[in-house]
Amino acid sequence: MADIRNFTLNFGPQHPAAHGVLRLVLELDGEVVQRADPHIGLLHRATEKLAETRTWVQSVPYMDRLDYVSMMCNEHAYCLATEKLLGIEVPERGKYIRVMFDEVTRILNHLLWIGCHALDVGAMTMALYTFREREDLMDVYEAVSGARMHAAYYRPGGVYRDLPDRMPQYQESTWTNAKKAAEKNENRSGSVLDFLEDFTNRFPTYHSEYHTLLTDNRIWKQRLVNVGVVTPERALQMGFTGAMLRGSGIAWDLRKKQPYAAYDKINFDVPVGVNGDSYDRYLVRMEEMIQSNNIIKQCIAWLRKNPGPVITDNNKVAPPPRENMKTNMEELIHHFKLFTEGIHVPAGEAYAAVEHPKGEFGIYFVSDGANKPYRMKIRAPGFVHLAGLDEMSRGHMIADVVTIIGSQDIVFGEIDR
């Protein structure tokens, strides 16, 4: 009699629930997963190697393209590592702006995550709600940087410029009539801070709508509860960070344990799960959005009262203000040298990590004293989480693999890099 062999199934890379270009080779016994083998590298763009041929500032836009839904958090880790090597301090206002945009980015990431996760599981409506809120936050990105996604707003030493005192207005066009444009501009008459404050006041109402749709939904709970359980011990052994670790009951958050920027002056709670399953990870990320909303409110209140510089005044690191550069020969020379030759960073090595929406995102630099990094290494949280997919999927059905991938919140820009 012939041996019974397990069935092998290719999941992706074109599958909509694969969250990018994941190719997952599943070994199945009927519909039960015996082994899950992730194949990565389909989005590899050699970011670490490219950084070796670019100046320290030129590599900032590459960071946006790693995890392309958590753009400014990637930039933050890069700038922190560069500043550590340079031994410079960011002005206080620059720190608060960074914290505020880190949290805007966290909400942006979690909105996309819950919209797509629900869509994968079969709850179609969620994505329509979350993309409505993402639009407002992307307008804030656009107001400060000119780009909706790849902002390149952070710089070694601070941020590119201070917050604008007026929001861009919608204009009448082929797609938007005068009435529609006026409706969209209702809360855009003030500054970026006014617009963002209005959003933070509205967001808890939207958030409660998400809870109404999903949290006690019988089908949602059946699909998530006791699926992809990770014990606290295993989560630590596998190197999980972020919501993947906190969902298993371990209160590890770099913003609390190793504060950077202005997080040591901000009040917020770290939500943790109990059971370590997909449902707990969902609840942790949902609560994180509310905590981020509160952090943004605190930053807005501080920024209103404390004007000041947003980037270091060391012209060997940051360019002088444009108006000075046009009237002062010395500052023109600084500007010219910075944009032709770049910063010369002292020889040494440094590692800096931030509490990224997906976990601990770290940048490790080795500098040989030149105007380019000798070596850059990216510590991507999603890479570690994807490595745990095999263990998390075993014994579950094929449909549960979709749930587990969704609860990991993986993006291939940072995994393949």
From Swiss-Prot:
Supply the EC number(s).
Answer: 7.1.1.-
Q: Which GO terms describe its cellular component?
A: plasma membrane
Q: Does the keyword Ribosomal protein apply?
A: no
Intracellular or extracellular location(s): Cell inner membrane
The record's top EC class is: translocase
Which of UniProt's keywords are assigned here?
Cell inner membrane, Cell membrane, Membrane, NAD, Quinone, Translocase, Transport, Ubiquinone
Q: Indicate how the chain sits in the lipid bilayer.
A: Peripheral membrane protein
Task: Kindly state which reaction or reactions the protein catalyses.
Answer: a quinone + NADH + 5 H(+)(in) = a quinol + NAD(+) + 4 H(+)(out)
Q: Which InterPro entries match?
A: NADH_Q_OxRdtase_suD, NADH_UbQ_OxRdtase_49kDa_CS, NDH1_su_D/H, NiFe-Hase_large
Q: Which domain of life is it from?
A: Bacteria
Q: What molecular function terms (GO) are annotated for this protein?
A: NAD binding; NADH:ubiquinone reductase (non-electrogenic) activity; quinone binding
Q: Name one Pfam family in it.
A: Complex1_49kDa
Q: Which family does it belong to?
A: Belongs to the complex I 49 kDa subunit family.
Outline what the protein does.
NDH-1 shuttles electrons from NADH, via FMN and iron-sulfur (Fe-S) centers, to quinones in the respiratory chain. The immediate electron acceptor for the enzyme in this species is believed to be ubiquinone. Couples the redox reaction to proton translocation (for every two electrons transferred, four hydrogen ions are translocated across the cytoplasmic membrane), and thus conserves the redox energy in a proton gradient.
> How does this polypeptide assemble, per the annotation?
NDH-1 is composed of 14 different subunits. Subunits NuoB, C, D, E, F, and G constitute the peripheral sector of the complex.
Q: What is this protein called?
A: NADH-quinone oxidoreductase subunit D
The organism named in the record is Dechloromonas aromatica (strain RCB)
